[in-house]
Amino acid sequence: MSSESPIRIGPAKNEGDLMQVLAIQEVVFIEEQGMSMELESEILDREAFHVLAYNQGHAVGTGRLLVLSEPPPGEQGRWGQVARMAVLRSSRGAGIGKALLETLSNEARKLGLNGLSLHAQASTQSFYEKEGFVVSSEVFYEAGVPHVEMRRGF
């Protein structure tokens, strides 16, 4: 029996991959959470680095990294923003979110970024804290959902 994980993370390289990213985001953010969002324009943002998580060949999670034009207030250097982290309900709890975040963090380091920021839903704050992110804002609302800004330097 192989101990190799059936989970694979890789960049979204083509239109088919980007459509899988969009499908996962629609399920998680719109169907599950009831958000009304304009995902398509974001998915077509070619400046973003999108990743997909596959479990036994099926796309089950996604996230993206954007390089910010300026660092967050109070920070120095070049920073990135992690956004649209989503894992299908049937695949949660298997370490996929952590693997996605690690892949995005590694890409940020390759790009020479000094840190990452993100807007975490209040319900996911503890996940990001376990990954070294620190809350850097009061609670605010995006798409009707409470969020906090979080940051992690490298």
PLM region spans:
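A conserved beta-turn-beta hairpin within the catalytic core of GNAT-like acetyltransferases
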Residues: L68-V82, R92, E142-G144
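Conserved catalytic-core motifs of GNAT/GCN5-like acyltransferases
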Residues: S117-H119, E129, V134-R151
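Conserved N-terminal entry element of GNAT/NAT acetyltransferase domains
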Residues: M1-E15
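Helix-loop element at the rim of GNAT/NAT acetyltransferase active sites that forms part
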Residues: A23-M37
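Conserved beta-strand in the GNAT
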Residues: L52, H58-E70, Q81-A86
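Conserved GNAT acetyl-CoA-binding A-motif
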Residues: L101, A108-Q121
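Conserved acetyl-CoA-binding loop-helix of GNAT-fold acetyltransferases
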Residues: V87, G93-N106
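Short loop/turn motifs at secondary-structure junctions and domain boundaries
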Residues: S41-D45
